[in-house]
């Protein structure tokens, strides 16, 4: 049967690899979401002021997560490429430098966060109960003091996932989350001889759990039993590696900032419609429901980063393309399957989150889920393609796609449709789908162009050792020969005009000359090797 379906025969093993990596990530995200829900329920028993305090504090903490993403995205891509290259020394070096960079960033965030916590919460709480600022500031200051625990947990997990181990992060995250729930209960309510610390207890419980998780991560790295083995070496900053991590990671971090700021304007537009506050409530409920629907797409995004990065680490761009294509296709299928029940059961899902069943909230929330369910296919394209490009170290297209989709599409289109054409909240929902389509189309075109291969090579050890001294025209000629066609080196003899590049290939090997410099290229089952001839 498979012989009659060559495409399926080719991609079925890749689909299995994607699911092998993605399923533990889905479970990890579910556990994290469960902990967040339980935290809200626990704090909710203290009263509405306490809920507001924690809610505002967690909004400020999103800034920390955006900064951390600037490290995790770069670390994940470089770890994947080092693992694919079968270079344990480089994988250990990437890990040590990622941890060092994280510690430096955490120190800065701790100092800044400690001083801005109360002023920022005061600004957010304009006209609200002043007790929310007092409680929220105490909670947030403690969290900022423990920034190093939070950030190292994220980076440790991302390094393992990039290197192809998504199971250990599942166990690690699951254990930390269980401890988080236990500690929060103990310190919030103070059973027995323990003091009831209320909102402050929630911060203490979180810090203790994250601290244990950080120590456990280091033990795993040094145990010698994980895919990442920390070999003897220095943790002193290597500014070249810091640059490589941030070159890949900063655009990913800025993507989060673009989404967050655009979302604030979307909320402002929603509240300006006839639905008002009820529309904002519907949007909040819709996003909460969608956060569960997003999990498979986000997990396949992580799998795509790891698989594409590993293929490029051993310089198999043809395999990287096949893996990326398979992940994108699988993401679309899975997200479409999730969209169907969102359309059918939208009213029931909204009512589940709003037991009062307020008519405007249910109506607006139902329309949100149904309109956005139609756009889940393009959302999958955007998510997974971004992950595949990240594996190649090509993260700028994701940032540009988000700018085009969010700021140049969603914000102006939502204003026009909702307020000028008076479509109300439905106009905002349509604008969100249009923005997703724009950003998804942009990154997909970038992926299909194959230019990410150039980015991957320029960030590789092959480039640093052999090609960095060449002119741009010579580099372009060399990259073209390696990229076209991707499946095999062509059998040909060629001289590229105006570059001094001579190219001869025979049965998977090639001699490439740049004036007085010559290189021998050999493609085998493990990848591409380049050496001076």
Kindly give the residue locations of the regions a language model identified.
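Short alpha-helical transmembrane segments in multi-pass integral membrane proteins
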Residues: 1-22, 79-146, 194-250, 308-375, ...
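Transmembrane helical elements of multi-pass membrane transporters/channels
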Residues: 20-36, 142, 176, 209-213, ...
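Transmembrane alpha-helix boundary and packing residues in multipass membrane permease domains
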Residues: 25, 29, 40-41, 58, ...
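Generic alpha-helical transmembrane segments of integral inner-membrane proteins
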Residues: 26, 30, 34, 38, ...
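Helix-terminus/linker motif at the lipid-water interface of multi-pass membrane proteins
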Residues: 30, 34-52, 121-130, 186-197, ...
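Helix-capping/transition residues at the boundaries of transmembrane alpha-helices
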Residues: 43-44, 80, 161, 169, ...
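Small-residue-rich hydrophobic transmembrane alpha-helices
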Residues: 51-111, 150-169, 280-346, 379-401
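Short runs within selected transmembrane alpha-helices of multi-pass transporters and secretion channels
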Residues: 72, 76, 142-161, 169-177, ...
């Amino acid at each position: 049967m498979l012989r009659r379906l060559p495409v399926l025969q080719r991609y079925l093993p890749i689909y299995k690899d994607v699911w092998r990596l993605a399923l533990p990530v889905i479970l990890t995200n579910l556990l994290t979401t469960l902990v967040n829900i339980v935290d809200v329920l626990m704090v909710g028993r203290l009263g509405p002021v306490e809920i507001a305090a924690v809610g505002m504090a967690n909004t400020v903490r999103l800034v920390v997560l955006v900064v951390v993403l600037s490290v995790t995205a770069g670390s994940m891509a470089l770890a994947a490429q080092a693992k694919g290259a079968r270079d344990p020394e480089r994988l250990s070096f990437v890990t040590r430098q990622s941890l060092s960079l994280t510690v430096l960033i955490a120190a800065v965030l701790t100092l800044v966060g400690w001083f801005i916590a109360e002023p920022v919460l005061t600004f957010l709480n304009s006209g609200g109960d002043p007790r929310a600022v007092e409680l929220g500031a105490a909670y947030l200051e403690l969290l900022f003091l423990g920034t190093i625990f939070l950030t190292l947990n994220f980076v440790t997990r991302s390094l393992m996932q990039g290197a192809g181990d998504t199971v250990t992060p599942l166990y690690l995250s699951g254990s930390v989350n269980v401890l988080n729930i236990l500690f929060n209960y103990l310190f919030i309510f103070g059973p027995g001889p323990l003091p009831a610390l209320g909102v402050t207890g929630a911060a203490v419980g979180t810090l203790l759990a994250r601290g244990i998780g950080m120590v456990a991560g280091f033990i795993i790295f040094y145990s010698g039993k994980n895919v990442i083995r920390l070999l003897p070496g220095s943790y002193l900053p290597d500014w070249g590696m810091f640059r490589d991590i941030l070159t890949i990671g900063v655009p990913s971090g800025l993507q989060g900032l673009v989404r967050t700021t655009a979302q604030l304007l979307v909320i402002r537009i929603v509240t300006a419609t006839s639905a008002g506050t009820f529309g904002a409530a519907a949007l909040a409920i819709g996003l909460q429901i969608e956060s569960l629907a997003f999990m498979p797409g986000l997990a396949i995004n992580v799998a795509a980063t790891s698989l594409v990065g590993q293929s490029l680490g051993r310089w198999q761009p043809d395999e990287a393309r096949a893996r990326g294509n398979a992940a994108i296709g699988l993401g679309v299928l899975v997200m479409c399957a999730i969209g169907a029940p969102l359309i059918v059961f939208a009213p029931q899902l909204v009512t589940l989150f709003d037991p009062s069943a307020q008519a405007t909230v249910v109506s607006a929330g139902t329309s949100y889920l149904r309109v956005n369910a139609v756009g889940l296919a393009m959302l999958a394209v955007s998510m997974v393609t971004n992950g595949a490009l990240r594996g190649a170290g090509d993260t700028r297209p994701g940032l540009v796609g988000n700018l085009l989709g969010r700021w140049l599409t969603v914000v102006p289109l939502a204003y026009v449709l909702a307020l000028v054409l008076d479509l109300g909240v439905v106009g905002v929902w349509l604008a969100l789908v249009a923005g997703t389509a724009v950003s998804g189309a942009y990154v997909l075109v970038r992926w299909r162009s194959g230019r990410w291969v150039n980015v991957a090579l320029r960030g590789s050890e092959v480039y640093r050792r052999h090609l960095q001294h060449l002119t741009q025209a010579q580099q372009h000629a060399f990259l073209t020969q390696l990229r076209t066609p991707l499946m095999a080196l062509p059998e040909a003899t060629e001289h590229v005009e105006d570059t001094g590049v001579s190219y001869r290939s025979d049965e998977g090997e090639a001699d490439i000359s740049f004036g007085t410099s010559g290189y021998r290229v050999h493609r085998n089952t493990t990848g591409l090797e380049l050496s001076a001839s």
